[in-house]
């Protein structure tokens, strides 16, 4: 039972890490990355549809994203969707494909992005602390119900703290990697 609680805590912490990675992937770091277009929803015959379901999206060059719609009549709709998403990118089209040139980041914008990275990382750490608190409460309840001894509870509580420390380091490393990517000129 207690092992199941520990396993659940580890899975939840891994999800918090994956959530941070996904959040950081949407930050534009000066290099073309198709994941910055993840929030773009295209009005496809009346229903909002993710961009990657109506077009082929790839990066032929370091600072260029090429969007090739499968239905050529969707070109203007895709352009509008990109502008509505407010990504700070100006789409240019030749009627069949859409090009998104990724401008180099200014120093001020880099600093703003690093602040965002820190904010997202802190949110991830708060999630980890909440998971730790929930797990410790579940373990204390088991001790109160007589399932765990006081010594077992202490051991599991230390294990939860070790697990939390491990994931805090993972989050910090993920953030440091993203900050380095952003600050690269």
Swiss-Prot record:
Alphabetically sorted, this entry's keywords are: Cytoplasm, Protein biosynthesis
A Gene Ontology biological process term: translational termination
MF GO annotations = ribosomal large subunit binding
Cross-referenced Gene3D superfamilies: 3.30.1360.40, Ribosome-recycling factor (1.10.132.20)
Protein biosynthesis among the record's keywords?
yes
Gene Ontology CC terms: cytoplasm
Q: Which domain of life is it from?
A: Bacteria
Q: Which SUPFAM superfamilies match?
A: Ribosome recycling factor, RRF
> Which locations, inside or outside the cell, does it occupy?
Cytoplasm
UniProt cross-references to HAMAP family, sorted A to Z:
RRF (MF_00040)
Please give the family membership noted in the entry: Belongs to the RRF family.
Q: What does this protein do?
A: Responsible for the release of ribosomes from messenger RNA at the termination of protein biosynthesis. May increase the efficiency of translation by recycling ribosomes from one round of translation to another.
Alphabetized PANTHER family for the sequence:
MITOCHONDRIAL RIBOSOME RECYCLING FACTOR PSEUDO 1, RIBOSOME RECYCLING FACTOR
Tell me what this protein is called: Ribosome-recycling factor
User: What organism does the record attribute this protein to?
Assistant: Exiguobacterium sibiricum (strain DSM 17290 / CCUG 55495 / CIP 109462 / JCM 13490 / 255-15)
């Amino acid at each position: 039972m207690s092992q199941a609680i520990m396993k659940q805590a580890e899975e939840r912490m891994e999800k918090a890490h994956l959530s941070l990675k996904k959040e950081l992937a949407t930050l534009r770091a000066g290099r073309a990355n198709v994941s910055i277009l993840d929030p773009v929803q295209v009005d496809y015959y009346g229903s909002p549809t993710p961009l990657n379901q109506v077009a082929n999206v790839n990066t032929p060059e370091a600072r260029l994203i090429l969007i090739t719609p499968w239905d050529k009549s969707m070109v203007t709709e895709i352009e509008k969707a990109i502008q509505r998403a407010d990504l700070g990118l100006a789409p240019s089209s030749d009627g069949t494909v859409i090009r998104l040139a990724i401008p180099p980041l200014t120093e001020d914008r880099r600093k703003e992005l690093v602040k965002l990275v820190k904010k997202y990382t802190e949110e991830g750490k708060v999630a980890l602390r909440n998971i730790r608190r929930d797990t410790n409460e579940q373990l204390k309840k088991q001790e109160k119900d007589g399932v765990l001894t006081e010594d077992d509870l202490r051991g599991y509580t230390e294990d939860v703290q070790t697990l939390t420390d491990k994931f805090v380091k993972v989050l910090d490393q993920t953030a440091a990697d993203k900050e380095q990517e952003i600050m690269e000129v």
